[in-house]
């Protein structure tokens, strides 16, 4: 690790490309990271069966509202802090450099973890599709390493190149989901029609096992906070970033709430749990639920297209999180928290050193999982996706506290709703969400203790589960200690370089 150094003047080698992204370019990266088609085929069916049944759409809506409340303060803060470190910088400004550094390490681990999780899911789906469609039998890790190399190549170029590719893939993905939702809506739903109350009334949302549904819903939103990461590359970031944040959350919320409602209504709200169990083979193939609804209300032709789009959705997520992790490495290197060499950019103004670091780390983990013979879904995907969502929600909680502290201290914005009320409401929702995530971590990560039932028991984790769930908190503490140690050796003036 290098010592903290003042941020150097912007030169060709240490500054990102300016004014490359507009609102929609940033939204493409963020919504692509959420991988809505993957969520519809994976998280939604599981939440229906193990969570609160027909009320899963309302759960997504409620989580979306919590995150919109979070975004009020987040967007307000982005007017005062424009930095590729985003959360790192926000928390540093509000709670001090030590906590800011700790949160930076937590965020970085979260982005690396979710990318690894997507690699695992991609390997499973790609291996299955290639074998079924073309008879090409190959180990999951072969397809993963091909995607790993391609993601690195694309991340090497200007950020707007990646945005254009993600835009094309995302439009196809959203269009396919919209067709399914509208088809069910215009047909009036299944035998029971379009039941609003069964899906959106509070009494329905908090029935059954809502904790499981909320855990999966929060997991489906991971990546939305990445809007501010692109602040330095945005056109007019003080306007672009807040707009992109609100728009991204609205798109994700509406998409998950409406399409999952269409899935529930298409089958029938009173029988959705039993039918989902039967259609998916007791969740052995959760994607079968969406395929069944699509077959019935649109046609098998769209189902076949969507099976391919699941792969493009996963690939889009890989590229989005590659960009996020690379930019965190860049920001932390520029601040001196990590080696200064990480703040280098290439001729395309992309964070080349950060991208290399991300690629090397993920490559090592993928190869290790392959050598050990671990399962790409049960281990690589489940472990790292659960770890990532706990880490991100932890950092979001700190951001809420930092926003309140920052504006109380500086008085730069005195609007109560933006700087106090909305952040407090969001904090309450996020704390509740984090509790549910940890309580049901065994179900999310597949790390239940021997003899326990993760669908019923809370906090029943094996050793691996406890290591994963406590890791973000340990990293926060160790990172804060590291940050304080670095600053204590330096001039107080360097704090601004670290958090701005």
Task: Name every feature range the model reports, one short phrase each.
Residues 41-140, 463-480, 487:
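Extracellular loop-to-transmembrane helix junctions
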Residues 140-191, 244-253, 391-394, 409-428:
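Membrane-interface loop-to-helix entry segments
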Residues 89-90, 96, 128-132, 244-319, ...:
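TM-loop-TM module centered on a large, flexible mid-protein loop between adjacent transmembrane helices
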Residues 43, 62, 387-395, 417-500:
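A generic transmembrane alpha-helix motif of multi-pass inner-membrane proteins
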Residues 1-55, 67-68, 72, 194-203, ...:
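Membrane-interface "cap" regions at the ends of multi-pass membrane proteins
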Residues 46-57, 124, 128-140, 160-170, ...:
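Transmembrane helix-loop boundary segments of multi-pass membrane transporters
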Residues 83, 106-121, 221, 226-234, ...:
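Membrane-helix boundary/coupling elements in multi-pass transport proteins
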Residues 12-19, 57, 133-139, 168-307:
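Helix-loop-helix junctions that connect adjacent transmembrane segments
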């Amino acid at each position: 690790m290098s010592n903290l150094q003042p941020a150097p003047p912007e030169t060709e080698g240490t500054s990102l490309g300016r004014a490359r992204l507009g609102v929609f370019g940033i939204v493409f990266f963020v919504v692509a990271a959420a991988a809505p088609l993957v969520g519809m085929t994976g998280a939604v069916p599981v939440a229906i069966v193990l969570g609160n049944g027909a009320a899963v759409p309302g759960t997504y809506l409620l989580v979306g509202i919590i995150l919109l409340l979070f975004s009020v303060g987040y967007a307000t803060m982005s007017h005062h802090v424009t930095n590729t470190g985003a959360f790192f910088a926000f928390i540093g400004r509000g709670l001090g450099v030590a906590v800011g550094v700790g949160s930076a390490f937590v965020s970085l681990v979260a982005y690396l973890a979710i990318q690894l999780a997507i690699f695992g899911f991609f390997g499973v789906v790609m291996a299955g599709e290639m074998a079924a469609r073309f008879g090409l039998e190959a180990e999951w890790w072969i397809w993963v390493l091909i995607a790993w190399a391609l993601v690195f190549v694309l991340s090497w170029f200007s950020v707007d190149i990646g945005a254009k590719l993600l835009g094309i893939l995302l439009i196809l993905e959203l269009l396919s989901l919209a067709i399914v939702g509208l088809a069910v809506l215009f047909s009036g739903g299944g035998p029971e029609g379009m039941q609003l109350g069964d899906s959106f009334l509070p009494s329905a949302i908090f029935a059954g096992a809502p904790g499981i549904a909320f855990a999966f819903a929060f997991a489906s939103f991971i990546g939305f906070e990445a809007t501010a990461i692109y602040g330095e590359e945005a056109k007019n970031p003080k306007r672009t970033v807040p707009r992109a944040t609100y728009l991204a959350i609205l798109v994700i919320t509406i998409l998950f709430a409406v399409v999952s409602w269409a899935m529930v209504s298409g089958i029938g709200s009173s029988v959705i749990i039993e039918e989902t169990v039967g259609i998916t083979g007791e969740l052995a193939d959760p994607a079968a639920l969406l395929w069944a609804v699509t077959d019935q209300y649109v046609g098998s032709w769209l189902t076949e297209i969507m099976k391919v789009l699941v792969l493009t959705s996963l690939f889009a997520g890989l590229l989005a999180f590659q960009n996020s992790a690379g930019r965190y490495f860049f920001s932390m290197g520029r601040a001196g928290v990590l080696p200064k060499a990480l703040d280098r950019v290439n001729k395309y103004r992309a964070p080349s050193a950060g991208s290399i670091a991300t690629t090397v780390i993920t490559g090592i983990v993928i190869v290790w999982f392959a050598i050990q013979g671990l399962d790409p879904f049960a281990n690589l995907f489940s472990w790292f996706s659960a770890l990532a969502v706990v880490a991100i929600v932890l950092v979001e909680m700190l951001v809420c506290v930092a926003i309140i502290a920052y504006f109380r201290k500086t008085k730069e914005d005195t609007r109560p709703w933006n700087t106090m009320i909305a952040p407090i409401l969001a904090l309450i929702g996020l704390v509740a969400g984090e509790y549910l995530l940890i309580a049901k971590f065994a179900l999310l990560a597949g790390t239940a203790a021997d003899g326990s039932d993760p669908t019923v028991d809370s906090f029943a984790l094996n050793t691996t589960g406890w290591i994963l769930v406590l890791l973000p908190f340990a990293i926060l503490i160790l990172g804060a200690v590291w940050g304080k140690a670095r600053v204590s050796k330096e001039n107080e003036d360097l704090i601004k370089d670290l958090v701005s």
